Amino acid sequence: DQVTSDLAGAAGRIALERAGLQPDDLDRIIVATDTPDYLSPATAAVTQAKLGASHAGVFDLNTACAGWVTALDVAAKTIVTEPEERFVLVIGAYGMSRFLDWGDKKTVTLFADGAGAVVVGAGSQPGWLATVTAAAGEYHDALGIYTGGTYRPATTANLAQYGPPHVQFVRKFPATFNTERWPPLIERLLAKASAAAGTPLRLDDV
């Protein structure tokens, strides 16, 4: 019966313990999830309360499967640009079992529940070198949970017509989607990281 904030809190406590920190040492908590406890308030606020991290500012971030790495990027840039913020707790939490149609083999074999967390802070050695981001918004209607938001509220009529909120594949992605989209991103990232590191980086260095 664990909800997303329970998973996030458990991962956050482990990360704090391994970092040798207390909840009140945190300046910010970012929870990356597309399965929040509620539409509002933020799951990060619920997690803050469960951790007892009363000093930390909080927000959720939703970029679906890319959520955790996006949150990590935001945290790293926060540490660089906000010197008074020393520690940011980044949590990726997934409670997708609540949104599965157990008769749909396309989704039940892909999605599950879990959480992971890290504490991001300044260090004496170079850490986060570079980020590149991209999105294919034209496929927003291909895979997702389409009931429960403002587009299709969870009204009695919509639930009767579409059923409860479930993750679903609506249409296929092109077979060449990954092979066409990823290599240019990797090349851009290596170029950007090379500039930040002051030395050329190649795939063999990764």
Regions found by a protein language model. Give the residues of each.
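Short, well-ordered, mixed-charge alpha-helical segments that flank or form enzyme active sites
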Residues: 38-40, 67-69, 96-100, 137-140
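Buried hydrophobic positions in well-ordered alpha/beta secondary-structure cores of metabolic enzymes
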Residues: 15, 26-29, 47, 71, ...
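Beta-strand segments within the central parallel beta-sheet cores of soluble alpha/beta enzyme folds
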Residues: 24-32, 59-62, 85-93, 129-132, ...
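Flexible, glycine-rich active-site loops centered on histidine and acidic residues
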Residues: 78-115
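Condensing-enzyme catalytic core mediating Claisen C-C bond formation in acyl metabolism
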Residues: 1-2, 104-180, 184-191
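Acidic-glycine-rich active-site phosphate/pyrophosphate-binding loop
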Residues: 38-52, 90-96, 150, 154-160
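Phosphate/pyrophosphate-binding loops at sites that engage ATP/ADP/AMP, CoA/4′-phosphopantetheine
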Residues: 11-27, 185-205
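Conserved catalytic cysteine-centered active-site region
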Residues: 2-6, 33-87
